[in-house]
Amino acid sequence: MQYQEAYNRLEQYGQTHLLRYYDTLSAAEQAALLQQISEMDFSVLERAAHEEAPKGKIEPLGACTISEIAEKQDTYRKIGLDAIRKGSVGAVLLAGGQGSRLGCNGPKGVFRIGINNDLTIFECLFRNLMDVTEQAGVPVPLFIMTSETNDAETRAFLAEKLYFGYPESSVHFFVQEMAPVVDKDGKILLETKSRIAVSPNGNGGWFSSMQHAGLLNVLKEQNIEWLNVFAVDNVLQRMADPCFIGATIAANCTSGSKVVAKASPDEKVGVLCLEDGKPSIVEYFEMTDDMRNLREADGTLTYRYGVILNYLFRVDQLCKTLDCSLPLHRAFKKVACLTADGTATVKPEQPNGYKLETLVLDMVHMQENCLLYEVEREKEFAPVKNATGVDSVDTARALLKQNGVAL
């Protein structure tokens, strides 16, 4: 892309200030800035200008409960294992985050969760996936989403660890796409004179990022019909779970979600409901007090099934989402940016920029239906989000020990 072409493109979106320092840059810096402009999706700015749509009519949605699953476990497991053996199932690990909140400078997955050994979050997840591959007798294709920040370090770490025994040929990497950061007036921030301030485009961008990386060709070549997407920060996460896959297929659903019963009405977790007759995840802050506290005749919460970011999607339905624009969520954050006089890059003490993100929960609402698959919290939900307190390293370690994992 040449300067004039970049200027014309930026003018279309009212962002020509990004070229303010162009004439002061070296040839290499100019080329890098033009490259960044050429690759950037500026259409998100138009979507960001619109208010998020209000929720429709919300109703409770029942689940395939733990007791119901136990009754049909053998049937579900056989269906799921058959699908895995056919090569119809892939797993997608969302691992773009950093471990900064855990006191770790690298990727969150390399954080050491072990106490007396070197067990990392990545190793926990690879072990859990290998449990499935041993049952099935075949590997499950694993797609790992990294970020610009941690891609090289993630690849190097897993290569050094020899993928914890997982076949390297079954592991595919792709980098999460980035979105520009804007100020209160909708102007894109500069990080330096030659670099636009960007941030990851949210966990809802995982499938479009797979497409961008050319991995939809792999799905087609290998006849992968289902993708199980899950987050890096749950060390008890059971992925490519044959029983979960089998139950979703048996129910003729186009998607499935693992859920846990909420510990209390005030637990800050998204709840899977129906919105205007379609599956939808309602965030904690979107629920009224009445909804949070509503109970059934048996005393259980009416809106009780919380999501744990473990979803199963049919690939043909995911492909349809590529033609639609997921809702854009704006998060007001502290973002390192160039000072007004252009002399230095600083990270402000107060939030100064909107990060533009899509969320995987909005992909659920685009599905015709979704099977809620209840799992035991103590066996499958040990999030590692904080250094101490709730959902922390300590609570995750306690749950790992409870499940017989040596630390």
Predicted segments with their positions:
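Hydrophobic, well-ordered secondary-structure segments
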Residues: Q2-Y3, N234
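N-terminal glycine-rich phosphate-binding loop and ensuing alpha1 helix
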Residues: Y3-H172, P180, L190-F207, L216-N217, ...
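Conserved structured core elements
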Residues: R85, V92, C104-P107, N116-E123, ...
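Hydrophobic/aromatic beta-strand patches that form the interior of the parallel beta-sheet core
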Residues: V92, F111, F143, H172-F174, ...
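Short, flexible loop/turn elements at secondary-structure junctions
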Residues: A95, G114-N117, T146-T149, V175-M178, ...
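Short acidic, glycine/serine/threonine-rich loops at helix termini
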Residues: G103-G106, E153-A159, D183-I188, M239-C243, ...
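Conserved beta-loop-beta/alpha segment of the NTase-like Rossmann-fold superfamily
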Residues: Y163, E168-E267
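Catalytic core of tubulin tyrosine ligase-like
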Residues: N223-N228, L236-A240, I245-A406
